[in-house]
Amino acid sequence: MQIARTPEVPGGKTPPKVGNRRERCIVLPFSSPNGKFRVMGLSVIVAALAAVPPAAPGGSSKVNPRDGLTYQWIPPGSYFTGCLPEDRECYGLERHREKIVVASGFWIGRTEVTQAAYKRVMNAAPSFYKGADFPADRVGWTDATAYCSRIGMRLPTESEWEWAAYGGTAEVPTEPLGSLAWYDPNSNDTTHPVATKLPNGFGLRDMLGNVWEWVQDAGKGPGEHILKGGSFYNTSRDVRVSGRLSAPPDLRHRDIGFRCASSVWPEERSASGSVTRP
């Protein structure tokens, strides 16, 4: 595996441009006889959500007192991976369409974990771009897992993340991608404060763009895990609900962050193990 990186400049300043933009993004191996690398993608971009089946809107939201962030209840539902025949930007692996059923509801962060929350829980400030309400970046899978555990939660599964990212809608969004996500055309090569773009149908922010987000699922190589959603570095072709990267758990890059999830609200687990759902 090879990771393309940008030199980091002390003080959180934007470094000079190096080569073309694709070379400044994280890129991972893709089966190719010529040995080239690219981002792996598996599904449609935001504008191809018409095939997603309808679902009830998200339910209640709560603040986790351990990190101070708001979490949204996402109902069960189903969606399709893969691209529509008319989508000309699909990668080869996206041609296969498959129905995914998320059988149980779950809680998920309304935003990416912020730097203020990360400092509060982990007593650490690893981020390259600085700002209390900016997403925590340069966070590895192991770090993200530890954070979620400390607040009584976990990383979402890839299917949970995708279902949440679709927003429970069967209609093509009327908003352009730029109103939903910080990505290559509008980011100015930096992350941005969370929740400054429009929410999706479940009320979630920045599911696409800003920073890649770790999920539980194992990746392509030994010990690797999956990253979702694209980042401020990526173009619309890579900022897809089912686009994915596979990376080692100790990868800490400045366009990588996360959000937490849980099947049960942490404060509603009793000593007997019974739970309360919304």
Task: Name the predicted role of every residue range.
Residues 41-50:
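Bacterial N-terminal signal peptides
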Residues 64, 80, 84-89, 127-245, ...:
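Functional-site microenvironments in short loops/helix caps that host divalent-cation chemistry
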Residues 31-42:
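Bacterial N-terminal signal peptides that target proteins for export
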Residues 264-275:
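Short, charged low-complexity linker/loop segments at the C-terminal edge of domains
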Residues 62-127, 209, 257, 264:
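A short glycine-rich, aromatic-capped structural motif
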